[in-house]
UniProtKB/Swiss-Prot annotation:
Modified residues (N6-succinyllysine): 68, 84, 110, 162, 183, 191, 200, 346, 352, 363, 365, 390, 415, 457, 477, 480, 503, 527, 545
Enzyme class: oxidoreductase
Positions bearing N6-malonyllysine: 457, 503, 527
Primary location group: mitochondrion
Compartments in which it is found: Mitochondrion; Endoplasmic reticulum
CDD domains attached to this UniProt entry: NAD_bind_1_Glu_DH (cd01076)
PROSITE patterns reported in the protein's UniProt record: GLFV_DEHYDROGENASE (PS00074)
Post-translational modification Phosphoserine, affected residues: 79, 128, 227, 384
Entry similarity comment: Belongs to the Glu/Leu/Phe/Val dehydrogenases family.
Protein name: Glutamate dehydrogenase 1, mitochondrial
Location of region: Disordered: 34-58
Length: 558
């Protein structure tokens, strides 16, 4: 199935013309025919044209079904990697048996395994009763526990939670976090409920998940998402620990994104936005990719626009601003603002906290039109899914699209961006900072000790002993005739001498994770000649890892 699709896709799409005019190192990285193993060029032969996967899909809607959209991206990756998976199987089976095995496991990976649909009543503060709807989808249990956020939104649907759960599976695989994918949603507008009512909804939803076996430190671990945060996660942890987890010493590991006092971890609030920054950093500093885009490496002369000024948008903006990029526009659901001279994230954050909106910010003007189409180098869609579509993709002016949100780009828009030589840094890599630091928090809860507590003093003393040893060695060699020879550490080293704090360890671990994963995606793109199609490279990377788990573990009762 996947091979047939892949063969069809290999027929009729030529790579972007811009690739042929790139620098030599860029051409070596990105200029070959996409999707085929690297071979020496043959004089006089042009690369075979190829179709993009969205052209092969039956669904050509500008607003596709979200889960079908993710499945389409998966199919594209599967069609690219199937032959390699068959080739790498080290068994005595025939070629046909190997291919059947590979296709069978790919069919296991693709669908969403479990979807729990709930409805429960609450009594509101005015005495009226209301029935609340909620969902929890578990896409894959190839690794346990499952992991994924809980969002509160009137747009929540079965299709949405299935799509987001599947993205979580691939996201965890891309950054080597050993979780399966899951997602939950409660169909409410939290602005219409009091804090007391939201606590009732959250605690009751937790109990419903617990009764059905959809929450637990080793089963399924929720996290914050749209319109939820530390407060809601604290309610969930307390509800679970006070009921079904009463005798479980690891009960507070049932959820991540908690306050520090409830077992949370330093750096979790900003983790997704910081991950977005590190993801962009890894690609924007790669000279070969920047030469393809006609840009210079680094943040120094870059402008960017953020759509969505929530947790992800704010922290992405803060870190890019801190490293020299200039934010020229910010968009929200009620309007957008623009200032070509730059917008300060702290000033805008303070204004929004005071007024509840970014509109009216004195150091920017109202932007007429779609902020997604504003003139900038980097566009960060950090709001909701399916924001970049076939309709607006031709008008996007950014050279880099950094997907801070889940699923902001439809398949048709993705095709257009590839044709226009626009680099899309995909969601399943770029916004994985949240689940990465959630993994660190989960490990902290299981270990029952904060990061660095056992080593703070030892590391500090070791550093001072090292400096003293160097000083004494120099004095023995050159003598003390001119006095002692003090060893003065630099400011950066002085900050580290006292030992790494938990936040330092978390930030370092996140930066390393994003860097390593970016390199894996780049190598995969080169290996399969995918050019600027980083999304397919990320999906291929994820599929290879999930496939390996299923293949080596074996399939029970088949």
């Amino acid at each position: 199935m996947y091979r047939c699709l892949g063969e069809a896709l290999l027929l009729s799409r030529a790579g972007p013309a811009a690739l042929g005019s790139a620098a030599a190192d860029s051409a070596a990285l990105l200029g070959r025919t996409r999707g085929q193993p690297a071979t020496a060029p043959q004089p006089g032969l042009a690369p075979p044209a190829r179709r993009h996967y969205s052209e092969a899909a039956a669904d050509r809607e500008d607003d596709p079904n979200f889960f079908k959209m993710v499945e389409g991206f998966f199919d594209r990756g599967a069609s690219i990697v199937e032959d390699k998976l068959v080739e790498d199987l080290k068994t005595r089976e025939s070629e046909e048996q190997k291919r059947n095995r590979v296709r069978g496991i790919l069919r296991i990976i693709k669908p969403c395994n479990h979807v729990l649909s709930l409805s429960f009543p609450i009594r509101r503060d005015d005495g009226s009763w209301e029935v609340i709807e909620g969902y929890r989808a578990q896409h894959s249990q190839h690794r346990t526990p499952c992991k994924g956020g809980i969002r509160y939104s009137t747009d929540v649907s079965v299709d949405e939670v299935k799509a987001l759960a599947s993205l979580m599976t691939y996201k965890c695989a891309v950054v080597d976090v050993p979780f399966g994918g899951a997602k939950a949603g409660v169909k409410i507008n939290p602005k219409n409920y009091t804090d007391n009512e939201l606590e009732k909804i959250t605690r009751r939803f937790t109990m419903e998940l617990a009764k059905k076996g959809f929450i637990g430190p080793g089963i399924d671990v929720p996290a914050p998402d749209m319109s939820t945060g530390e407060r809601e996660m604290s309610w969930i942890a307390d509800t679970y620990a006070s009921t079904i987890g009463h005798y479980d010493i690891n009960a507070h590991a049932c959820v991540t994104g908690k306050p520090i006092s409830q077992g949370g971890i330093h750096g979790r609030i900003s983790a997704t936005g910081r991950g977005v920054f590190h993801g962009i950093e890894n690609f924007i500093n790669e000279a070969s990719y920047m030469s393809i885009l006609g840009m210079t490496p680094g943040f120094g002369d870059k402008t960017f626009v953020v759509q969505g000024f929530g947790n992800v948008g704010l922290h992405s903006m803060r870190y890019l601003h801190r490293f020299g990029a200039k934010c020229v526009g910010v968009g929200e659901s009620d309007g957008s603002i623009w200032n070509p001279d730059g917008i300060d994230p702290k000033e805008l954050e303070d204004f929004k906290l005071q007024h509840g909106t970014i509109l009216g910010f004195p150091k920017a003007k109202i932007y007429e039109g779609s902020i997604l189409e504003a003139d900038c180098d980097i566009l960060i869609p950090a709001a909701s899914e399916k924001q970049l579509t076939k309709s607006n993709a031709p008008r996007v002016k950014a050279k880099i699209i950094a997907e801070g949100a889940n699923g902001p780009t439809t398949p048709e828009a993705d095709k257009i961006f590839l044709e226009r030589n626009i680099m899309v840094i995909p969601d399943l890599y770029l916004n994985a900072g949240g689940v990465t630091v959630s993994y660190f928090e989960w490990l902290k809860n299981l270990n029952h000790v904060s990061y660095g507590r056992l080593t703070f003093k030892y590391e500090r003393d070791s550093n001072y002993h090292l400096l003293m040893s160097v000083q004494e060695s120099l004095e023995r060699k050159f003598g003390k005739h001119g006095g002692t020879i003090p060893i003065v550490p630099t400011a950066e080293f002085q900050d580290r001498i006292s030992g790494a704090s938990e936040k330092d360890i978390v930030h370092s671990g996140l930066a390393y994770t994003m860097e390593r994963s970016a390199r894996q995606i780049m190598r995969t793109a080169m290996k399969y000649n995918l050019g600027l199609d980083l999304r397919t490279a990320a999906y291929v990377n994820a599929i290879e890892k999930v496939f390996k788990v299923y293949n080596e573990a074996g399939v029970t009762f088949t």
